Amino acid sequence: MDFKQHIKEVADYPKEGISFKDITSLMQNGEVYKKSVDELVAYARERGAELIAGPEARGFVVGCPAAYALELGFVPVRKEGKLPRETVRVSYGLEYGTDILTMHKDSIQPGQQVVILDDLLATGGTIEATIKMIEQLGGVVAGIGFLIELDGLGGRERLEGYDVFSLIRYED
């Protein structure tokens, strides 16, 4: 299926010069949304996933249904202050400053095979922070899957050494 035809591009959003790739148009079509999640499920299964992790908020949009389909647990990766129990945390760089991501300390067991799912790979900063926490807890990153990858922003290069899968790729 050509998933790209179901992504709407919004010019100059969220700021001038940006061509925003809007996944909500894909999600509004139940058949297409299901097929996109099914592709990520197949990828996670191939990679031997024992657990799915996804960064907020759009990682939940693909990660939760994939975990459900695979009958696996889902680990939410959240911004600081959003999880109620003891967490691990990683600071990561943004275009203008830094942010902190967290996950529960008891969410991953040593040696557990974790597949990370998210909506979009751009620079890879959020996923790199997610990887650090998974590995800090002793988990193994078995693969990383995305609906969309924006080539030319260094994300794939930043994740070198990990298996990366994308349903849709946009060149520069």
From Swiss-Prot:
On whether Cytoplasm is a keyword of this UniProt record, the answer is: yes
* Cellular compartments annotated: Cytoplasm
Which InterPro entries does the UniProt entry name for this protein? Ade_phspho_trans, PRibTrfase_dom, PRTase-like, UPRTase/APRTase
Which GO cellular component terms, listed alphabetically, does the Swiss-Prot or TrEMBL entry include? cytoplasm
- Report which reactions are catalysed by this protein: AMP + diphosphate = 5-phospho-alpha-D-ribose 1-diphosphate + adenine
Biological process (GO), any one: AMP salvage
| EC number(s) from the headed UniProt entry | 2.4.2.7
Alphabetically list the UniProt keywords. Cytoplasm, Glycosyltransferase, Purine salvage, Transferase
- Top-level taxonomic group: Bacteria
**What is its pathway?**
Purine metabolism; AMP biosynthesis via salvage pathway; AMP from adenine: step 1/1
Entries under SUPFAM superfamilies matching the protein: PRTase-like
Family (UniProt): Belongs to the purine/pyrimidine phosphoribosyltransferase family.
Function, in words = Catalyzes a salvage reaction resulting in the formation of AMP, that is energically less costly than de novo synthesis.
This protein's name: Adenine phosphoribosyltransferase
Organism per entry: Exiguobacterium sp. (strain ATCC BAA-1283 / AT1b)
Its taxonomic placement starts with:
Bacteria, Bacillati, Bacillota, Bacilli, Bacillales
- Tell me what gene encodes this: apt
